[in-house]
Amino acid sequence: MDYDLFQSDDEEILATFIQATQKQETLSAQIDVDDSEEDLVDGLHLPEFNCSGRDTLKSQLCEGGFLGNGYAQLDPPRSRLDYLCFDFAPAQLAVGAVRNYLYGEACKNVQKLLTVVMGQQHLQATAASMNSGWYRVRQQVTHFYHLMLLLRGNELLPSHFLDGFRQLLNDQLDADTWKVLYFAEHNKGNDCQAPAYHLYHGVLEWRFLDLHILYASGNDQAFLGQLERTLDDLIVCAGHHYRSKHRSELIHSSPFMCRCNKELWLLLKRLIPKWLGERELDFWTLFHKAMQRHKSLHFQGESNAISLAYHELYSWLRLGLARLDEYNSEGWYQPDHSPLTAAPESFQTASLLKQFLASQPDEQQRRVYLIQLSPLQLQLGKPDTDVLCQLWEYFHRSLNCNFSVGTELDQLPLTCSNGSAYVDRYNKLLSKSHIEDLNLSSFTMYAWMLGKTLKLLPSQGRSNQRQKLLGRIFSKFSAAKLLALNEPGIHHVIELFLCLLLCHEDLSELAPKLREMLLCLALEKLPPVRRILVAKGHMALLLLHAQHRLSMDDYVSKLLNQLATIRNDAEVGAIYVGSLQAIFNLADDFNRGEQQLLGPWLAHYVEKCGQASQDRVWQTLHNLILRLSERRAVAGNASGIKEALQQHIMPLVRTQYVSSHSSWLPKLAANFIALENNGDKLLLGFLQGPEPINMAASAQLLLQVLEDGGRPASSTILQVWVKSLVLLNAQHESVLALMPHVTQLEEFRLLAIDPTSLEGGREPLCAFFGALGRRAQQEEAAAHVRMQLSHKLHAYVNHFELWLPPDRSRSELGSRFYSFLAIVIYNCSTLAYVRSKPSCFFHLAMVRFLLTTQLQAGVPPEGRLPQVVHKIFPVLLQGIGRLPYRTDAYVAKTLEQLVQHWTPHFSFSSNAKLVARPYATLLQADVDGELAQFVLQLLVTQFLVVQRRRAGQHAGLVITIMQQLIESTGKEQEEQLLTVLRGVHIPLLEHVMFVDEVDLSRNQVFGLYKVLISHDAYKRSQAVRDMCSNHLRSLAEKHLAHCTYFYFQMLINLAELAPDLVAPILSFIREQAEQVELKRGAGEDVGIRKCLQRLQKVLSRV
């Protein structure tokens, strides 16, 4: 609205009147003024309202206002006449005509402001030129009131002046006018040029000054009527202000449009008790009557919506007025320095609450109302227990409701995650002196208000009212009602109980009663979701028992009995577990029944829950055991806790140590070892039992024991180190952490291991067992020394057969483990093998891993095991080669079985060179060739035997291996070729002799011969050729008499391939043939002669 519509044009009238009055003689016109000079305050500026914009809850009042200038007194200060803004001398103001003129001007100025504000357009032309003059117009009226206040004791002051003026304002300021005026605030203050601003603030000033003048007149009836009219107008302004707000804004907004409006309310609140004196009326009584009049005029109707709107305005304005007491006499906001002792009846909280609740408010309306009610109960006045009783009567019928307003805010979790969270939440809530959070449900606000009130009542000497209030609450909780609660209802009961307990210093009386009420919610009678909620409530109460050092024996026993009735339900158990850490942390001497929490239910829960939940249990138990060494615990019931741990938790830890991946279990096992008198025995029990699925468990356990100050045996440390190197690797953090402890051992230092061999990515196992083996092979090492070293080796690898889990044998871990077997056998075979001792490393390695019953029965090995054994095979053979394999029947048999059962499985690749690699590596590594020859003899003996002229299943594989051995031999490696031939040449020729002519292996052997005779070493070495010839001679001597045809067939085929090999022995063959004929005694044998002729014919062709 454009307020600049009017400008006064009375200058000529004013000038004329001044001239007329100046011509009068001063002495004849003067009126004797009753006020004496000494009653006037020199230098006092006339107060006025100077706006600073919208009011806030804690805004300071204007220093130059009425309150700061002493106008809250019955007899306000008086100023000199020359401070008034009129164009008259002070003496002229005493002239009756002047006062008549000023009265007329005041009436006219008010009409100007009213007219322009209400928008009469015909005044627009004159208003445009007065933009800067509305403040002057308002000020002249205000100063007229100051003049009247100054002359209020003068008997000649016409009473009709103010009566008419008052009537003018009362007639013009109706509801429509206030609807335009109520928001006419501005942060520029009196520099604002809007006429509505000056009319609004002028009316506030005029009404206030008029009340002062009217009170001084002694007309009580008129004064009380005008006071009521002023309150009515102020409430109308507040009503318009209320309608401009959303409901949620009310809790953070001031009910006063600006601080000028607030200051007028505050002035009236301070003056009314002085004005009314001994009368039965006071400010709050007048206010409540004014609100009733406001309701009849502006909230007409019987609907709940109208009633609720009225009560919202009522509670908002009532709170704002109550907070005015937080301002001091100078207008400064000082809530901490203002004594607030208003009686409950002043606010009429109980009666108004009853009307509000009867109007069926929704949840948001309840929340806003309770936020505005709580300061009246707790900060601004004494608590009214009737209010809490009314609210309980209202809420207890709705416990099963969600108290939701249906907005996104209410999608936040209703319940807490566990008992600790419940206690923390309501501790934090009750620590607040006031609440303004609309996310809290109305029931939560009630519980908070109830708790705060119960805490406040004893300090006011009203303990009996607290007991009555508690009795009123408890009377509503029967067992049947508790069992009828749904999930929200149980949550509400929990938060109610917690608010009651948290506000009591001594829980010894209240806690047992509440826990028994909660125990009425028997778990077996509830569905799963409600069980969980009840369990959270129990844990919250149990925590409070622990905090206040109350006995928990009976309570815990009943809780665990209820848990047992539902078969130790894991979800309920999880709630119990969630509070264990907090309960144990609060225990100092463990004398209040904490040991009962370490029962079978906990083991049942751990077996059912997931890894993360288990870890929380382990961490809790770890922290608990650490606390048992504290002085107060030792003096208390630490022994009872230890007994419970040993009885119920130790068996659980043993099984979980093996079956769980948790890194907490090694720490917990170390804790139990520290508790034991014979800790070393328990340590060995963990280390030598079934291997944990957590491969680092042994190292982690040992490290924890060492960190705890334990001193395990050197062999134990080395065993764990070796096992960790096998199951993990040298770069694993646990192995690296263990290494400093290992290198400090005397046993380790005696091996004189080069430290660099343990670094740089090398395999420490090779260095360690290599050094151990070299120590045993030293010439000066006596038999008993070697025996001691053997014992140490077996201690280092104790129970190694348990290290590799069956399900991991085909993984990378399996490869590392089989490599470990090969490393030990290669480096320490003489220590690993003990004759006639089935438990020695060598025997166990064979029967459990390398020569298993399944393998010997013909069951193919699974997965990548053939590749793994293929890789370590030459190392194994070399290690066995250091044993007396020719004289020790067991070793010889083992070697034979390794060749027999594993060679067929080396055909996993079509790459012949790869397949033959184990034997090729052995051939190259065996310097004297003795072992290689022995192994090759075993190989051909096993697989080249011919039965019924048919080759064995794996003959082709072995022939291929032999051919690869020949091909891989360098031209300078005559000895290697001789080794091969010594081992396989004769069996190969015999295979050709006796196998069927159509068998593939026969052609394979001839193909091998082609490779042999084309080999550079064969061509260059006479010894190789001589050996081949000698083998042919030996075969002639052996087979010519009985297998004449087979021998000559083989020889003829060789002659076709290598005539140079056969030709030199032709004469020997002839002589052997003649010898056979002589032995037979039948003369020349036609068959032999024909074979000789064919052989000669073949040689002659070549």
Curated annotation (Swiss-Prot):
It is found in: Nucleus; Chromosome. One of its GO terms (cellular component) is nuclear replication fork. It holds the Pfam family MMS22L_C. Keywords: Chromatin regulator, Chromosome, DNA damage, DNA repair, Nucleus. It comes from the Eukaryota. The keyword DNA repair applies. Disulfide bonds: none annotated. Involved in recombination-dependent repair of stalled or collapsed replication forks. Belongs to the MMS22 family. MMS22L subfamily. This is Protein MMS22-like. It comes from Drosophila melanogaster. The lineage of its organism: Eukaryota, Metazoa, Ecdysozoa, Arthropoda, Hexapoda.
